[in-house]
């Protein structure tokens, strides 16, 4: 007999191995061609961080990523200054330049204060990321946060021109900052997950530290929304105590 068909048992195809740790999506960075395209300038960095965050994460791993990091920091400073001008319109006068300087400077200082702890937590978690890559991810966090704040700026300006409540304006800016921070931390978490870290415990701890540092920085650089006799405070306060004191301020009298 001429049997042209095999008689052996049918063997099912092998089950593909699970994705390696640090790649929750199952796709390593740079697998798609568009992720490997360079990001030439700050404008392209804004477009990439909003539409193609994986492209930013991949480029931060490549040699010569300093230009991208500088571009994202430039975007963060520029957007912070613009949003700070909007914040300063509530009180006017000196705050038109003081608020932008304090917001941009405070955000950068907070990031620099928290950068060493993030790198240490990354190393303890088994991450293979270089310090430059971690610094780039933090720059991306700041850029995305401030870009979102620019999106909220028209709403903040409207309320700053139509209300005299310092507590309400402070709460509104905190809400906008909180929303922007959530999205920024999502970007940072996604980038952190691609560094082969075995645990997120260190990253989650760092998030708490970063939020506390930024909140305390707003108190250390007060006043940002309102006005005071000096540009910087002469009294040390915890940010919660400062919020409580703001709520106790007398309400402004209604205009005739």
PLM regions: where:
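N-terminal juxtamembrane cytosolic/stromal segments of multi-pass membrane proteins
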Residues: 2-69, 241-256
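Short amphipathic alpha-helical segments, especially helix-boundary/capping motifs
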Residues: 28-35, 93-98, 111-112, 133, ...
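Long, solvent-exposed, polar/charged low-complexity segments
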Residues: 38-48, 52-57, 185-256
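Selected alpha-helical membrane-embedding segments in polytopic membrane proteins
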Residues: 39-129
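Hydrophobic alpha-helical transmembrane segments and adjacent short intramembrane/lumenal linkers
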Residues: 101-105, 109, 118-228
């Amino acid at each position: 007999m001429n049997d042209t068909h095999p008689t052996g048992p049918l063997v099912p195809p092998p089950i593909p191995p699970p994705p390696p740790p640090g790649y929750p999506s199952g796709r390593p960075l740079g697998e798609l061609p568009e992720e490997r395209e360079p990001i030439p300038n700050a404008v392209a960095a804004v477009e990439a961080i909003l539409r193609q965050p994986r492209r930013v994460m991949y480029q931060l791993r490549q040699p010569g990523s300093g230009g991208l990091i500088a571009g994202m920091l430039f975007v963060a400073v520029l957007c912070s200054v613009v949003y700070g001008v909007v914040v300063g319109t509530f009180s006017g006068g000196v705050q038109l330049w003081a608020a932008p300087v304090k917001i941009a400077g405070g955000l950068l200082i907070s990031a620099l204060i928290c950068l060493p702890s993030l790198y240490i937590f990354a190393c303890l978690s088994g991450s293979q990321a270089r310090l430059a890559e971690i610094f780039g991810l933090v720059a991306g966090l700041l850029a995305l946060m401030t870009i979102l704040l620019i999106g909220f700026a028209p709403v903040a300006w409207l309320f700053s021109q139509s209300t005299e409540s310092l507590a309400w304006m402070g709460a509104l800016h905190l809400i906008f900052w909180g929303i922007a921070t959530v999205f920024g931390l999502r970007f940072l978490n996604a980038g952190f997950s691609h560094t082969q870290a075995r645990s997120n415990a260190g990253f989650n701890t760092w998030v708490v530290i970063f939020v506390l540092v930024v909140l305390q920085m707003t108190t250390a650089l007060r006043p940002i929304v309102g006005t005071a006799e000096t540009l910087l405070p002469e009294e040390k306060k915890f940010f919660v105590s400062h919020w409580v004191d703001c709520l106790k301020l007398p309400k402004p009298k209604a205009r005739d």
